[in-house]
From Swiss-Prot:
SUPFAM superfamilies: Carbamate kinase-like. InterPro entries: AceGlu_kinase-like_sf (IPR036393), AcgluKinase_fam (IPR004662), ArgB (IPR037528), Asp/Glu/Uridylate_kinase (IPR001048), Glu/AcGlu_kinase (IPR001057). Gene3D superfamilies: Acetylglutamate kinase-like. The record marks K8, K215 as: Transition state stabilizer. This is Acetylglutamate kinase. Belongs to the acetylglutamate kinase family. ArgB subfamily. The keyword Signal does not apply. It comes from the Bacteria.
Length: 245
């Protein structure tokens, strides 16, 4: 959809939106842009897990999720992060709606590898009808990084991968993957642009590592699907642009 911007909010931004972030969203909406927000909540999940003396383990940047962890993740994403983000946006006169009952119907997922990751999903399909209905009414949908499989089981999904799938399904003009760092760093400097053909080598050489791997992989997938721009950074305007080439 023309004029659609998908914003993935993660890290510190997922706990508290800055005034600059709110102002930029307001400007885009005033200019006729339609916005979808996808969020993670790793910091809150880590805190809740720590309070319960439960271990946190990641493989290739993805959180290993036991079935018993899911209520905690739901509490963090739906009960805390998503609710707070939606309240902040609405308080700033940005009409928003947190997807709760519609989330599983919108995000269809399946296990990535249950033996390795547990209840971690990969997106199989995004049912866009409800999202399009909200966007047509000038409402910002707010999606937590969760989905359901065919058996109705809840799966934890990496928020970068989910945002990429949403952007691709809506054929958005831009995807922004917000994080706590300014962009992809090489020799302590932000790379202004990375071409899709350079990604494999930068992963092999360790320039792209840890939690940045799923961000870059989702960015590449999104660019190749026809989405105009993918930006990785700590704000809505600057960072590392992922481009086809």
């Amino acid at each position: 959809m023309k004029d659609v911007i998908v914003i993935k909010i993660g890290g510190v931004a997922a706990k508290k939106l800055s005034d600059k972030f709110i102002k930029q969203m307001q400007e885009w909406i005033a200019a006729g842009k339609k916005i979808v927000v996808v969020h993670g909540g790793g910091l809150v999940i880590n805190q809740l897990m720590k309070e319960r003396q439960l271990p946190t383990r990641k493989v290739k940047g993805l959180r290993v999720t036991a079935k018993s962890d899911l209520p905690i993740i739901q509490q963090a994403l739906l009960g805390q992060v998503g609710r707070t983000l939606t309240q902040e946006l609405n308080y700033s006169d940005i009409e928003s709606l947190q997807l709760v009952s519609h989330l599983g119907k919108t995000v269809s997922a399946d296990f990535i590898d249950k033996d390795v990751y547990g209840y971690v999903g990969q997106v199989k399909a995004i049912q866009t009808a409800y999202l399009e209905q909200l966007l047509a009414a000038d409402i910002v949908p707010v999606l937590a990084s969760l989905g359901e499989n065919a058996a109705g089981e809840l799966l934890n999904i990496n928020a970068d991968y989910l945002a990429a799938a949403v952007a691709s399904s809506l054929q958005a003009e831009k995807l922004i993957l917000m994080t706590d760092i300014e962009g992809v760093l090489e020799d302590k400097k932000v790379l202004p642009q990375i071409l899709t053909s350079q990604v494999s080598k930068k992963i092999q050489t360790g320039v792209i590592k840890g939690g940045m791997i799923p961000k870059i992989e989702s960015a590449v997938q999104t660019v190749l699907s026809g989405v105009g721009q993918v930006l990785i950074g700590d704000n809505l305007l600057t960072g590392t642009l992922i481009a086809e080439g």
